[in-house]
Amino acid sequence: MNIKWKSQLLLFMVAITTSVVSAYSGFGASNAMIESAKKRELNTTATLIQSNINEQINKASARASLVSSLPSIKQAFRAKDRDAIATRLLPAMIVQRDQFGVREGQFILPPASSFLRIYALKDGHGEDLSGFRQMVLVANRTGEPQRGMEIGRRGLSIRAVYPVKDDDGLIGSFEIGLSFSSVLTQTKTNTGFDVGVFIDDKLMTEVAQLIPRPDNERIVGGYQAVEVTDWTALKPLLSPAIFAKVRDVSTELITLNGNDYGLVLVPVLDYKGERIGAVVAVRDFSEFQIQQRWALTGNIAMAALQIVLLTGALLIVVNAMLLKPFEAIANASKDLAEGKPSSDLEDLAVRKDEIGDMARSLQTLQASDNDRNGYKESQNA
């Protein structure tokens, strides 16, 4: 194989190596950005779930604080006048229920005896709540507001229990309970994740006796689905192993049937900070898979184009600057050795590099050879 073909093969290999390295680096950078976007989505969703829970707790507290501080309510509660309380609160509480997710409003006498349920005026008068409503017991015992999540007869609620006091002292307490659905709806609206809240099945069975027990398929790893945005979206990704991880906020990427999914777990803590369940959020991450495939395809196509362009450019430059001049010098040297008139090297001789030096040297040799030939001819004459 002559130098021309060796050099062209070498240039082709250099172009391939350069293009492959460039494509690999480009895909690596694109893939890193996509993976970072996935993690950012997961972390943002986890933060938003926690923020939404805290927001609902604050809303429950604001409502309970407002009602418990109204003078007319204090007066009616002290007089144990249920009709007066209902007349003052029921219209506003119906609006709160229908538009803002308030599911419970209840007045409670110490230590934990139900006095009036706003949304069930005739039900539960005098019911003893002390066996399962620790928030109420603590609020009535300490006279301090209690806020957070707790399971009641009608299931899980985001609650705030505020003492009702007048100049004569503690009368009892007023409780607001919000549905968890607001947390789920806000999260899905803002992130696209389908969300569900899962609570310890044993606790729900023992306490939430006014709601039906869910189907067995909605009980996973000892946790039952209390509220979900879309059960069909969550179901394939749930397993006992997932709930075994619910000790802290965690995120995970799961591949199922060739599709990537993002999964977020946020522990549900009761008002005492004890874990009673988890919020699970999932989202189809196939859009990121498509981006990764496009990145791979684009980098491969770019590498192929780069190989063609780089090889062509290198061949043009090397042929013009080196191979063609070397070929001309080689032909001139061969002609000189055979005693033939050499090719014209004037174009190469004007160059200020090594090729120009070689061309000028050959011109000098050619001139010397011509002089010797002329001398011999004159002697022979």
For every predicted segment, state its role.
Residues D81-A92, I118-E150, S181, G192, ...:
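Extracytoplasmic/periplasmic sensor domains and loops in membrane signaling proteins
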Residues R154, D167, I176-T185, K202-L203, ...:
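Helix-start (N-cap) segments at beta->loop->alpha junctions
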